[in-house]
Amino acid sequence: MADLLGLSARYIDEGIYEGPGSVNRVTTELSEISSDIAVVEAFSHVVTFKTGDGLVLFDTSLEAFAGGIKDNLRAWSPEPVNTIAFTHGHVDHISGAGTFIKEAEENGNPRPRFVGHENVGKRFDRYEMTNGYNAIINQRQFGGGGAANLMGNERGGGKPLKISRFGPSEWVKPDTTFSEKLAMKVGDTTFELNHSKGETDDHLWAWIPEHKAICTGDLVIWVFPNAGNPQKVQRYPLEWAHALRQMEAKGAELLLPAHGLPIAGKERIAMVLSDMATALETVLEQSLKMMNEGARLSDIIHSVKVPGHLLEKPYLRPTYDEPEFIVNNIWRLYGGWYDGNPANLKPAPEAAVALEMASLAGGVEKLIDRARALAEAGDMRLACHLVEMATLAAPDHKEAHGARAEIYGKRRKEELSLMSKGIYGHAERESRKISDVNE
């Protein structure tokens, strides 16, 4: 049983950062936070409360982890599960629900009550409508293995990735829903559920007054807030910052996130919440200021900066999402999809533009050579543009794809965020197959 509170205090108080795996641990290990509170660390954590009338769980993690989570919970408490609250409807938080339903049936206990925001069920319906797309983008985001496989994809030995489905075999929708607020009393414990948009439109955070504790879900994740994911639906940075400020005002003495380490101490918690809110607010304020002045999206992307002292915090490193992506999401939310470049309003096919550029350059080989030179000089953004044009102009050109694999592979290694690494790694693998060049 790890001393998670001691670990988080050391990281925060001393400004220590030992990599993303040190704060987001995937172990299914249960750690007791107090006699009535435990955290099971998994792909997303399960936070559990003893109430005197059964356990209350926040989230169930992924289906693949749920069995181990259940076993470790049972080693801690024999109490049946009374209620499961979904902090939001992402699959890494809800997919293990069936395990706890099955356990209740096998033990002759009542089915757990499932509680969530009214949009959770609508999210599941949307996931079914776009199931193939969600399987593909999660495979790409998480690098084609590991978490992607856990989300419904399968890979045979040496065979191409087989995309089966996204999410659990059966969606368990909340049977108790709410719009803005819901107060629950389970046993001797009160749970005040509050809706706030943030990473999703169906998110809740909970204040548990008897413990002076907050369950944050993904509103706190020990990385830069995931408000810009380039392959996912809309995020809400303004509302996210508001939620963090509301949590800060509670004066909590215990913070229980769904990813990362739990945090104890009123002042320490207030600082973390304030820093996260400030980081979102500064990206939002800079972006909206430039939008209101008529700037193009490209200019805003390359102008908005987050103060370095915030990015150095161990709980604000951009190792999952990053500020540049949040700018794109702010533009989409408040400004639509037209980026300010008239040529992009009704563009020519990308391949046609690439063929024209190759012709002007004197052939695809010229684009390849220049892309490699730019990559060697460290200008990876321009290098990627040119090598992408080369393969669009000549889709079967093995040397072009060899260069594309090299350049995207180099960029993948240099990037910090998992989202960037996933997309560039996917492009690298695509071209390696065509070029017949192994890494």
Where would I find each of the regions flagged by the language model?
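C-terminal regulatory/interaction regions
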Residues: 2-5, 289-439
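Divalent-metal (often Zn2+) His-rich catalytic cores of metallo-beta-lactamase-fold enzymes
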Residues: 223, 236-299, 303-340
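Metallo-beta-lactamase
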Residues: 122-195, 239-251
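Active-site-proximal loop/helix segments of hydrolase catalytic cores
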Residues: 190-229, 233-245
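Active-site neighborhood of phospho(di)ester-bond hydrolases with catalytic His/Asp-centered motifs
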Residues: 58-60, 80-90, 115-117, 196, ...
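Divalent metal-coordination and catalytic microenvironments
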Residues: 36, 49, 59, 73, ...
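Conserved beta-strand hairpin/beta-sheet module of binuclear metal-dependent hydrolase folds
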Residues: 23-77, 205-217
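Active-site metal-binding motif and surrounding structural segment of the metallo-beta-lactamase
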Residues: 23, 30, 64-115
